[in-house]
């Protein structure tokens, strides 16, 4: 790993994940910028998480962005929209938001509030979606490399390699 290369890592909420990644990739902790996120996918290309990513990349001159998630990360057992729908007051608000999702494109990139509230079906898919969203963002400098990884037993696997091995299909966007 290049001596002073800054890497922005967007990781899950698991304890010790940052240290495990730094050891596995031979990254000095002082060269790692870390953002923690509950879900593996970026649901809004112009939301708070993306704004934080853009700010950290520019402020710290990060040369790479890594989205790294534990391969066996526990996805939510219960759908958040189911929890919100149990409350009558929140249910009314959900219907209003659903109307906005249906009628206020392109502000909302998802087609429904349920799609916005729910993460991807699996961790690998969420990481791949995030990599694609960051690569396409016009405020991410073109020289910044964007990569996705799954970590299992302290071993990092590039997400594009993971998809080829598991599906035989390479889901990728422009090399960046």
Descriptions of predicted regions:
Residues 10-12, 36, 67-70, 147-152:
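Short beta-strand segments
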Residues 21, 71, 97-101:
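Generic hydrophobic, helix-prone segments enriched in Leu/Val/Ile
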Residues 1-50:
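Short, conserved "active-site rim" segments that organize catalytic pockets and cofactor/ligand binding
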Residues 50-57:
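Short secondary-structure capping micro-motifs at structural edges
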Residues 58-78:
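Ordered, amphipathic secondary-structure segments that act as subunit-interaction surfaces
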Residues 1-5, 14, 40-45, 60, ...:
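Divalent-metal-activated hydrolytic enzyme cores
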